[in-house]
Amino acid sequence: MSVPTVLEKIIARKLEEVAERSRRIGLAELEQQAAIADPVRGFAAALEQRVNAKEPAVIAEVKKASPSKGVIRDPFLPAEIAAGYEAGGAACLSVLTDIDFFQGADAYLQQARAACSLPVIRKDFMIDPYQVVEARALGADCILLIVAALDDARMHELAAVAKAHGLDVLVEVHDGDELERALRLETPLVGINNRNLHTFEVSLETTLDLLPRVPKDRLVITESGILNRADVELMEINQVYAFLVGEAFMRAEQPGVELQRLFFPDRARSRGVVADPE
């Protein structure tokens, strides 16, 4: 028997978690909570506005820990981080809510969203319609669908539930086969994860290799591995203007200032922030 990958372990735990949560709060009650949640803020629209202007559309991540790196930020203050990201020029937020592997929490999403006016994606491993409704009840504006974690039927089902609740969908891929499956969804948002979710190794070539296969009517977000100004410029030269970045910001003393330094160096210099030497 082969050893389960990190992703397989996460999905196995997520199945248990959904069962536990649905016993505590039934779907009907959750639907009622979703119906009275704050209106959605337009996640896809915020990215499209920046990308159409060829400006960096940064999805800035609020993340305490990861399976590969352990605790990344401590103390961890989601509201303070979110406000800093907005001041630094982020287009959207990504907030980890997975508890067991990323030390996330639903409350972190609520705290971050309340501290700013940016649209927020619930960054979690979505495998069941219950979680989609839960995302809207928490106030999320978008959900993540990871192709590697879903079969086609479930992926389309979750996308339909998201649409019914006014949520945007970011579909995430890592290779050509996953991209082919992802493009069957209606969503314009295609995230290319430079991190292999089975091995957690990172290569920016993943985005560059898959980019020619993405239709022009889709918006590509490059995810993971953007660590310095050279990485940003490499993507922009290849007409990729949307980025999901977490660790590079989370390790900085002031995440919002680091965002500005990486993506808006002219603005950062005018405020006395030292530019990235790379």
UniProtKB/Swiss-Prot annotation:
Keywords: Amino-acid biosynthesis, Aromatic amino acid biosynthesis, Decarboxylase, Lyase, Tryptophan biosynthesis
One annotated GO molecular function: indole-3-glycerol-phosphate synthase activity
Pfam families xref list: IGPS (PF00218)
Catalytic function, reaction form: 1-(2-carboxyphenylamino)-1-deoxy-D-ribulose 5-phosphate + H(+) = (1S,2R)-1-C-(indol-3-yl)glycerol 3-phosphate + CO2 + H2O
Listed EC numbers: 4.1.1.48
CDD domains for this protein: IGPS
GO biological process, one term: L-tryptophan biosynthetic process
Pathway(s) the chain acts in: Amino-acid biosynthesis; L-tryptophan biosynthesis; L-tryptophan from chorismate: step 4/5
UniProt keyword Glycosyltransferase, yes or no: no
UniProt cross-references to Gene3D superfamilies, sorted A to Z: Aldolase class I
Entry similarity comment: Belongs to the TrpC family.
Protein name: Indole-3-glycerol phosphate synthase
Gene: trpC
